């Protein structure tokens, strides 16, 4: 794959994914203004990047450790481990929004502009987790990471599949996970980290709403559980794209309807682990 022309949004996305430098990865320079014509590559070709470059300090592992029990969060190092995991989730999400800009240049510019906006918001969430991590005496790279999101999302062959997995699936599930961990961190006495998780939950509602809107536009039909399920890359199941219990209030605000949520709750369990 050849890199996009310098100074374009596509080049900014390319650099975010490919840079081996930690600081550029976690806090990249501002992108070109997507409202300007010159910010976009002329006649861009699809660039499907199989994986992101990782700085040497970010040790990647093939299998994640089990999620700590709530009582273990009274240990600051355990909280730091989880915050580091959340930071890496946000990094992957930011990279994958950039990935979709490069992979699907034929999509409406409004869609790709929205992907850039979501990418920047994920980097803001990353910065919040990074600050909380530092308050506990830890830094990015202190714990191993797993590129679980990359392993799945980079297999998406169409824009609708990307939106189905990244937006409706992974970000939808984060509505449950962020609320659950916010309660656990607060119970462990870490109200500052809980507040960050609650902020992430609120802002992810908008990300999921973007996915609902664009899944409908890309498929030409209202969001429907069966259509969403069929759009997911195999062998992924909706069973691993949710938390227990369903964050019904947040999901309804994001645009899911009650029938969709009932189908999601009834989804049979799967052998595929959703440990990231």
Residue ranges and their predicted role:
Residues 1-276:
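Non-heme di-metal
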């Amino acid at each position: 794959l050849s890199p996009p022309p310098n100074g374009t949004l596509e080049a900014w996305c390319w650099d975010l994914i490919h840079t081996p430098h930690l600081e550029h990865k976690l806090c990249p320079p501002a992108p070109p203004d997507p409202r300007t014509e010159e910010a976009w590559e002329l006649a861009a070709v699809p660039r499907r990047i199989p994986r992101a470059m990782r700085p040497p300090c970010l040790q990647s592992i093939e299998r994640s450790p089990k999620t700590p029990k709530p009582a273990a969060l009274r240990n600051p190092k355990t909280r730091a481990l989880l915050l580091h995991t959340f930071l890496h989730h946000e990094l992957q999400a930011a990279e994958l929004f950039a990935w979709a800009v490069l992979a699907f240049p034929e999509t409406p510019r409004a869609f790709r502009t929205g992907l850039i906006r979501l990418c920047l918001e994920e980097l803001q969430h990353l910065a919040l987790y990074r600050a909380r991590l530092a308050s506990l005496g830890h830094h990015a790279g202190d714990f191993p990471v797993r590129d679980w999101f990359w392993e799945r999302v980079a297999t998406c062959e169409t824009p609708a599949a990307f939106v189905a997995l990244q937006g409706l699936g992974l970000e939808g599930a984060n509505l449950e996970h962020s609320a659950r961990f916010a309660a656990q961190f607060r119970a462990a006495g870490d109200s500052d980290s809980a507040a960050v998780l609650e902020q992430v939950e609120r802002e992810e509602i908008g990300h999921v709403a973007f996915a609902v809107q664009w899944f409908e536009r890309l498929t030409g039909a209202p969001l429907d559980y069966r259509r969403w399920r069929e759009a997911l890359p195999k062998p992924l199941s909706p069973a691993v794209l949710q938390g227990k219990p369903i964050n019904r209030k947040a999901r309804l605000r994001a645009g899911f309807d009650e029938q969709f949520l009932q189908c999601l709750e009834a989804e049979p369990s799967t052998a595929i682990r959703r440990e990231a």
